[in-house]
């Protein structure tokens, strides 16, 4: 299940966890929900990754500090370090391999 984060300080807090996926979305983006649902379904077998949505329309600071120029954007972090960033086109196999590598 994907949780929503609204407060910038919470975003910083979760990026410092072991393995986290953040999906940057917009309220006006029609494909964002589809991508988020696909990511959630594809990641069900990975129990060690936490998944979060952040609406960039509601959080300008997140958009600016994390350099989100388009949505949807998927960010994967481990212990405060960005491991992966993908926007618009998503290589699900690459995401799976990365999560598998860092969750073992």
Where are these regions (language model features)?
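Short alpha-helical
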Residues: 30, 58-61, 90-93
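N-terminal leader/targeting and pre-domain segments
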Residues: 1-19, 100, 104
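Structural micro-motif
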Residues: 66-75
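Thiol-based oxidoreductase modules, predominantly thioredoxin-like and allied folds used
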Residues: 2-5, 24, 40-43, 47-61
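Chalcogenol-based redox active-site neighborhoods
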Residues: 3, 34-37, 65-66, 97
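Local sequence-structure signature of Cys/Sec-based thiol-disulfide redox active-site neighborhoods
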Residues: 9-42
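Non-catalytic, surface beta->alpha helical segment in thiol-disulfide oxidoreductase systems
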Residues: 76-104
